[in-house]
Amino acid sequence: MKVAVIGAAGGIGQALALLLKNRLPAGSDLALYDIAPVTPGVAADLSHIPTPVSIKGYCGEDPTPALEGADVVLISAGVARKPGMDRSDLFNINAGIVKSLAEKIAVTCPKACIGIITNPVNTTVAIAAEVLKKAGVYDKNKLFGVTTLDVIRSETFVAELKGKNPGEICVPVIGGHSGVTILPLLSQVEGVEFTAEEVAALTPRIQNAGTEVVEAKAGGGSATLSMGQAACRFGLSLVKALSGEKGVVECAYVEGNGEHARFFAQPILLGKNGVEEIQHYGELSTFEQDALDSMLDTLKADIKIGEEFIK
């Protein structure tokens, strides 16, 4: 199984590469690519970690050698948020990066599962889909917006609030991956009850957690380490499912049946071909239903920006 990390010299990419070097199954191949000349050095550094995962690093203008034969491609390339920016401010730079990478993937490894981390995810996933579609290789079961960070934040914050072990908390998060489009389904957390006040406080905290980190880093970056952890969790789940493991479920932003929007995050059963089944997320509370209804216009507008960028 070959996993390619694209944008591997960045804050997320290096953290993700470190975690994958430690946690991929024995015999896996890990390829790192970034435009930055330091990338082969990052691979050399990680190659000294004694795990049975082979690693190679590539730099320069062309990601092709890293993409060749890849089963999973995780894209974290692009610029990060600075204080005062929201995820949509990143669009002007990151849209072009995702477009050119998707064009390379379409030629080099069109059957790979692609996890997009590069923000704004609501929009960049639509860009990748349109590029792959134009190339005649789009498989909606193999393109994912990685929203796992919203899930791990939800698990962490719920566990903190309720004095529980975060490993025992499961919070489905639906919608998109920015601001109001992030909807944690707190009504569905098993074994935990919330007051209306707790839900009203916790929901925006989860939605704005990225901004919390951007401000705390005071211009020195965005959420790179927690995002690396989230991307690793999603990447490992994909690898397990592609290897034939059953019952692997993660929330992700995918093209489904279009019930709410063309792309929508919800729990996904992963399988040997990517998305095996889009699971229904169950009954919503009144608070959640209202939040869902009021965010859909924002989500649809984000998607449209991506589609129109390619047309």
From Swiss-Prot:
NAD(+) binds at residues 7-13, 34, 94, 117-119, 227. Transmembrane segments: none annotated. One of its GO terms (cellular component) is cytoplasm. GO terms for molecular function: L-malate dehydrogenase (NAD+) activity. It holds the Pfam family Ldh_1_N. The active site is at residue 177. Substrate binds at residues 81, 87, 119, 153. It catalyses: (S)-malate + NAD(+) = oxaloacetate + NADH + H(+). One of its GO terms (biological process) is malate metabolic process. PANTHER family: MALATE AND LACTATE DEHYDROGENASE, MALATE DEHYDROGENASE, MITOCHONDRIAL. Belongs to the LDH/MDH superfamily. MDH type 1 family. Catalyzes the reversible oxidation of malate to oxaloacetate. This is Malate dehydrogenase. It comes from Aliivibrio salmonicida (strain LFI1238) (Vibrio salmonicida (strain LFI1238)). The gene is mdh.
